[in-house]
Design a protein with these regions (language model features):
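Short catalytic micro-motifs in class I SAM-dependent methyltransferases
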Residues: 203-212, 234, 257
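Short conserved AdoMet
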Residues: 136, 212, 226
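Short, glycine-/aromatic-enriched active-site segment of Class I SAM-dependent methyltransferases
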Residues: 40, 232-260, 265-272, 293-299
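A short glycine-rich, Lys/Arg-flanked "PGG" loop and its adjoining helix->strand segment in the class I
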Residues: 215-230
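Residue-level signal for the nucleotide or nucleotide-sugar donor/cofactor binding architecture
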Residues: 76, 209-213, 262
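Short N-terminal helix/helix-N-cap motif within the alpha/beta-hydrolase-1
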Residues: 212-216, 243
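Conserved N-terminal segment of class I S-adenosyl-L-methionine
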Residues: 1-205, 215-219, 283-284, 295-299, ...
Length: 335
């Protein structure tokens, strides 16, 4: 399928100050490698006995070539399906500890909770509208947001009259959403107990890139859908302007946390392998904002002329399929 045509008049700007409260994004970047810092301090690297070889998480092939190294970890490209992924990795228990750690909860508080209301209005409502477009004739869709964080999409869906539920591993995020009256649970998908075929829509926003086995999770989500139901996901776009401008310094290349890197082609391939028909694919990002931040904070340079037209440039980046985030809606086949 083709990237949809977009009109510049429809471009919605992002209030960076509201999205990223003062200091919160820098804190996230500064603590990027914190889970491995002590290991590297003691050993000069990540000890080999802590790392586990991994085959391609999409097609299962072990045939891959070196792509790049960052943060003492290796990223490779599958020679069969072209997926880019981290290999080797830590075990699953390591990543679960990271996402429930006190430090990660602090990051969520500073970045997610403080911007929750803005995220609900700017992003939550937009995502609900995009899902609604794919669910005609369903007055009150039943919706599950997997990895819901503070529940800003769940809140927008609830306010639109949906039966909206969210699950997340981070207890601080879930507790905050519950304090707003949202139906959130601090539970893993595989332990949630939801019945197959019980949802009209399931979302995975900024989730698949974190998983050792994204196919297992995507398959579980597909099983929860009724025939004709949709899965809506966001993942970083490896073919984005961010990587073209900053190379491996692009912020989304974060191998201590992001284990899988998709392109429009490889994300469509993943959907097809799970009998999901891609019905919507677009890109959206803050590539120019992140690049200007990088130039200013890391390189000590200023690009005032670019800053003045960054929003307009970002529209064309998004429309050309080079935005930092891939937005994909895929439908469960009815046959």
């Amino acid at each position: 399928m083709q990237i949809p045509y977009r009109r510049v008049e429809e471009y919605q700007k992002v209030d960076i100050g509201a999205l990223r409260p003062a200091g919160s994004y820098k804190q996230l970047i500064d603590k990027r490698t914190h889970p491995i810092d002590e290991l590297v301090r003691q050993h000069g690297k990540i000890p080999d006995d802590l790392l586990i070889p991994r085959t391609c998480p999409t097609c299962g092939s072990a045939d891959a070539r070196h792509e790049l190294d960052k943060d003492h970890l290796r990223i490779v490209r599958c020679n069969r399906c072209d997926l880019v992924y981290v290999n080797p990795t830590f075990d699953e228990a390591h990543y679960k500890r990271v996402y429930v750690s006190a430090e990660y909860q602090e990051i969520v508080r500073d970045l997610g909770i403080k911007s929750h209301e803005y995220r609900t209005k700017r992003f939550g409502q937009e995502r609900v509208r995009l899902m609604s477009d794919q669910l005609p004739g369903i007055a009150s869709p039943r919706f599950l947001d997997v990895g819901c964080s503070t529940g800003f999409v769940v809140e927008a869906a609830r306010d639109a009259g949906w039966d909206a539920i969210g699950i997340d591993l981070n207890p601080s995020a879930v507790e905050y959403g519950q304090s707003r009256g949202l139906n959130l649970r601090a539970v893993a998908l595989e332990e949630s107990g939801y019945k197959p075929g019980s949802f009209d829509a399931v979302s995975l926003f900024d989730v698949l890139e974190h998983l050792l086995d994204p196919v297992r999770t995507l398959r579980a989500c597909a099983q929860l859908l009724r025939p004709g139901g949709i899965v809506f996901l966001y993942v970083p776009n490896y073919d984005s302007a961010s990587r073209m401008l900053m190379g491996k310094d692009a912020h989304f290349i974060w191998p201590t946390h992001h284990l899988n890197y998709y392109t429009p082609a490889t994300i469509r391939d993943l959907m097809t392998r799970q009998s999901l028909d891609t019905v919507y694919l677009a890109t959206e990002g803050l590539d120019l904002v992140d690049y200007l931040w990088y130039r200013r904070e890391v390189q000590g340079r200023s690009d005032d002329g670019v800053e003045e037209i960054a929003d307009l440039l970002q529209f064309f980046v998004n429309a050309g399929a080079y935005g930092k985030n891939l937005r994909v809606i895929a439908r469960k086949q009815t046959r």
